[in-house]
């Protein structure tokens, strides 16, 4: 049996390991000193401690990961998402070390990871926002004046929504330019940055692609709407997008497939676009499995990790485009260990974690358990809740019920935000964009009324809490999470996440 080293941590390791076992591969894992009690270790047949706590000591340390793969005699290396997943140097080290990298080739990663080169290729197929790479402040000021403010300053080799700065004035640019170059160098290994026209409040829509260079077969699995974001990082995704007509969807998919064919893409990846006033703008290529891949799996019935393994192992991409039929609607909520108002990471120990069991309408991808101490060194993602239904309305209701049955205590989480977001009229009507969070209403002017309503219903559910001091009324009163669109009070579930 062949071994697959999953060079990552947390829920994505568990997700990949389950498919490895299903297909007859042996999943192997790594863990840091900070992750010695992590749940993903138990889902791997073999594991190795690669030491350290900070990412550059372990999950970003190519030499330690390659050494671990050799010690466990692995055949494949799956990078998951984040960390080294889109690093062309890592893919090359894997290949040079005699391992099969489960992802695109070194050359494709080099192209797709360079935002300037990727835009050059895409510009022959799809509209792109005006801009270019800049090396000096005076050059950047001249370009920004030419294309007009606001502009966005990005790391040329950046990704994952990190290091982006929207700038409204020349003073903003002067303050940010050198800082951005330093951040780009420390985070992505290159201080190169580029400036482009900032498209304000667009919708963010991506297309899931599978490619097999051995047969030149490129197919799509539909689009995903990813417009609800904080700090340019996604919080809620859904498929299909409510923004698209059949005509605009066909155009979007045609452009995405053509771009991936042009670069001879191999394995799983996505092409991301901004959508504003009926026009698409190419954004970037994500050359890895996405955090939100599960909603595509729910509507298509296709295991994307299985396809990755089939392609990498030489079995090939056997799916035929005309036989892929998406059914229903799916939503994903990313539950993070964060303050739900400021989205500030809040590591700590989970006192209690209760989640609904997976069923035909709800899927939970998580590495959380009661008593787990969340390390402060890594991403704040705790769990992904995926709901599906025959239509969007049913999928939303299934997600609401799942959120209200969750229990995470001991640390703050973004569950109150998600419940509130799913009750927002803009989301319910599918007419939202990337400014969604900035314009959310928290009803802070009705604190007294909401607090009174809570106290009225408190005696009925008091058995859910042992200590009344655990109830944070400020948190409860700031959100309209406890009211559905018809105004019914959700008192039955308040105490499940009141603290």
Feature map (PLM): residue ranges:
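N-terminal beta-alpha lobe that positions the nucleotide/phosphoryl donor
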Residues: 1-271, 275-290
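Exposed boundary/loop context
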Residues: 3, 73-75, 156, 182, ...
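Short loop/turn segments at secondary-structure transitions that flank enzyme active sites
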Residues: 227, 291, 337-341
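Short, contiguous acidic/charged loop-to-helix segments that flank catalytic cores in large enzymes
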Residues: 243-247, 295-300
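Catalytic cores of soluble metabolic enzymes centered on carboxylation/carboxyl-transfer
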Residues: 256, 296-297, 302-499
């Amino acid at each position: 049996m062949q071994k697959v080293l999953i060079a990552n941590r947390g829920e994505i390791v568990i997700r990949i390991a389950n498919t490895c076992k299903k297909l007859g591969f042996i999943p192997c894992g790594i863990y840091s000193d900070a992750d010695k009690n992590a749940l993903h270790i138990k889902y791997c047949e073999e594991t190795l401690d690669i030491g350290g706590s900070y990412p550059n000591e372990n999950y970003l340390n190519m030499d330690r990961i390659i050494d671990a793969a050799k010690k466990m005699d692995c055949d494949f290396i799956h990078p998951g998402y984040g960390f080294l997943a889109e690093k062309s140097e890592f893919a090359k080290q894997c290949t040079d070390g005699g391992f099969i990298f489960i992802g695109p080739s070194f050359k494709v990663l080099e192209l797709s990871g360079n935002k300037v080169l990727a835009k050059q290729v895409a510009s022959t197929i799809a509209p792109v926002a005006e801009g270019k790479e800049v090396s000096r402040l005076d050059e950047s000021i001249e370009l920004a004046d030419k294309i007009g403010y606001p502009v966005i300053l990005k790391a040329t080799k950046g990704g994952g929504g990190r290091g982006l700065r929207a700038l409204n004035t020349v003073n903003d640019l002067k303050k940010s330019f050198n800082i951005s170059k330093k951040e780009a160098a420390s985070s992505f290994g290159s201080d190169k940055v580029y400036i482009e026209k900032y498209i304000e409040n667009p919708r963010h829509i991506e297309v899931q692609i599978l490619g097999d260079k051995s047969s030149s077969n490129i197919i799509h699995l539909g689009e995903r709407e990813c417009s609800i974001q904080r700090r340019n990082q996604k919080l809620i995704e859904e498929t299909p997008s409510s923004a698209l007509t059949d005509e605009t969807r066909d155009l979007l998919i045609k452009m995405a497939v053509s771009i991936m064919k042009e670069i001879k893409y191999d394995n799983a990846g996505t092409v991301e676009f901004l959508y504003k006033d009926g026009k698409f703008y190419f954004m970037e290529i994500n050359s890895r499995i996405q955090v939100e891949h599960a909603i595509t799996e729910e509507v298509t019935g296709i295991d994307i990790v299985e396809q990755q393994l089939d392609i990498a192992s030489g079995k090939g991409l056997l799916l035929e485009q005309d036989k892929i039929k998406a059914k229903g609607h799916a939503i994903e909520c990313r539950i993070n260990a964060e303050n739900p108002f400021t989205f500030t990471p809040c590591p700590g120990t989970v006192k209690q974690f209760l989640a609904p069991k997976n069923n035909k309408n709800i899927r939970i991808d998580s590495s959380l358990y009661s008593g787990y101490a969340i390390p402060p060194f890594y991403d704040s993602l705790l769990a992904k809740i995926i709901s599906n239904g025959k239509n969007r309305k049913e999928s939303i209701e299934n997600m609401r019920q799942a959120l209200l049955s969750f229990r995470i205590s001991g640390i703050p989480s973004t569950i109150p935000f998600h419940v509130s977001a799913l009750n927002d009229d803009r989301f319910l009507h599918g007419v939202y964009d990337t400014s969604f969070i900035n314009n959310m209403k928290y009803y802070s002017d009705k604190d007294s009324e909401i607090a009174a309503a809570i106290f009225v219903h408190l005696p009925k559910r008091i058995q859910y809490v042992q200590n009344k001091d655990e109830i944070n009324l400020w948190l409860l009163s700031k959100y309209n999470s406890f009211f559905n669109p018809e105004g019914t009070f959700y008192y039955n579930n308040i105490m499940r996440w009141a603290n």
